[in-house]
Amino acid sequence: MEDRYGREIRSFRLSITPKCNLKCFYCHKEGRNEEHGKLMSADEIGKIVKSSLEFGVRKIKISGGEPLLRTDLPEIIENIKDDQIKDISLTTNGILLEKYAQKLKDAGLDRVNVSLDTLDPEQYKQITAGGNIESVKKGIEKAIEVGLTPLKVNFLAMDCTINQLPAIMDYCRKIGAILQVIEFIPMEEELKHHHIDVVPIEEEIGKKADQVFTRKFMQNRKKYIVDGLEVEFVRPMDNTEFCGHCTRIRLTYDGYLKPCLLRDDNLVDVANPLRNGEDIRKYFIKCIEEREPFCKAQ
């Protein structure tokens, strides 16, 4: 199904918990800055995802909070699996990944994205309020070992981390990971000074690239191959290309469909209607009808 702007719905991002075992100073909590309603069960998540298939969803991204804190995560993945779904991936901080990688693979998870903003152990502790970077590295190694690949490293480009980019690139190249350089979206006034313009950085990477591809169904973002390393840039801020080619809807941990990454004022309740025995397809239609590019071309 397409929205009013001709954008197909192909991807569904599921936040399955607000809880996290780190406390990164920049975290936007998927747009839900306070704990709200009841957490969805594994069965409810499965039913909502199965309903989404009718509207064109073919890729699932699981996130949190930290999704590995849910002990029923393997069950959630098993409930999501369907022949129509081409890809189930998960975004994690990696702290618990070494422990659970094999179980997730066995349940049907295809691949993981791991957040890693620095390779400096002390800086990592500062950013995450006490996290152990060695646990993350071991988790990455285990994920690759069991086949949760292609593994992507999510690097958040900020004023305090950008000097780590060359080292992160070398690390990803060494382990065979894809690197995603993500623009920081400051959700609070006191964090705005951490934002940096990643356009010049992307342009510099582009000059060094051996090959450049365009990902049509991922906001038309570019993919650069630099000395064997695959690098992508995710630039949501003031980006008409990002918004104009968005194919994703989202589900909050408490059961609301979220039409737009950058808005929290047009959520559509789907969990409570499901619990009341309603046909939830009309709520997907409402969500899709609510979709519009946050940044529109002039």
UniProtKB/Swiss-Prot annotation:
Keywords: 4Fe-4S, GTP-binding, Iron, Iron-sulfur, Lyase, Metal-binding, Molybdenum cofactor biosynthesis, Nucleotide-binding, S-adenosyl-L-methionine. Catalyzes the cyclization of GTP to (8S)-3',8-cyclo-7,8-dihydroguanosine 5'-triphosphate. This is Probable GTP 3',8-cyclase. GTP binds at R13, K61, T91, K152, R248, I249, R250. [4Fe-4S] cluster 1 binds at C20, C24, C27. Belongs to the radical SAM superfamily. MoaA family. [4Fe-4S] cluster 2 binds at C243, C246, C260. Pathway: Cofactor biosynthesis; molybdopterin biosynthesis. It comes from the Archaea. The lineage of its organism: Archaea, Methanobacteriati, Methanobacteriota, Methanomada group, Methanococci. PROSITE patterns: RADICAL_SAM (PS51918). Its EC number is 4.1.99.22. The gene is moaA.
